[in-house]
Amino acid sequence: MKKTFLSILAFGMLFTTGAKAQSDKVANDSVTVYEHEYIVKVGDVAPDFTLQMTDGTTFTLSEQRGKVVMLQFTAGWCGICRAEMPHIERDIWQPHKENKDFVLVGIDREETLEEILPFIEQVGTTYPIAMDTNADVFAMYALRNSGITRNILIDRDGKIVMLTRKFKEDEFAALVEKINAMLAE
């Protein structure tokens, strides 16, 4: 009986040590996750990417250096996105669309062009939309399976200055104010 107990105890210690080592390996190999499941934070240089736009052109983030850039991750199946997009159109895009120092790109996640076009027509969006059909660009900024809507504001040096999640009126107002202030500089 005593031998059986000691054998079980030794096996348990071995298993626990192995599990701890495996857990440490996973933690060391994983990305750091910040608030709202972002894997980037304010102050980070925004990860570069190139995506095809709905009009057939391409958009490369690093080519926008020197400009204030807002990325909006969205999708037609996202109710919060549908509620937020008219506000982005009215309060951000319309006042700044002619400003050569400002870039706004909606990034539609996991939808085809055939799905995106009716969606943007329904919500009345006229700002440019890029297609992230596999959510690969989204996964550079947040955990791949985390939710949207998300807005990322990037300064002229390519650094992230603001991250939003969901559509909250006070946070959206702060985003509009931040964009206006950055463009006034």
Which residues are covered by each model-predicted region?
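Thiol/disulfide oxidoreductase modules built on the thioredoxin-like
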Residues: E121-T126, D132-N180
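A short beta-strand-turn-helix
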Residues: V40, T50-V69, Y141
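Structural microenvironment flanking redox-active thiols in thiol-disulfide oxidoreductases
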Residues: R82-V123, N134-M140
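Short loop/turn microsegments at loop-to-beta-strand junctions
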Residues: A46-P47, V69, I148-R150
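N-terminal targeting signals for export/organelle localization
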Residues: M1-D48, E185
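Hydrophobic beta-strand anchors of alpha/beta hydrolase catalytic cores
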Residues: M70-L71, L104
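Conserved redox-active cysteine motifs that mediate thiol-disulfide chemistry
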Residues: R65, F73-R90
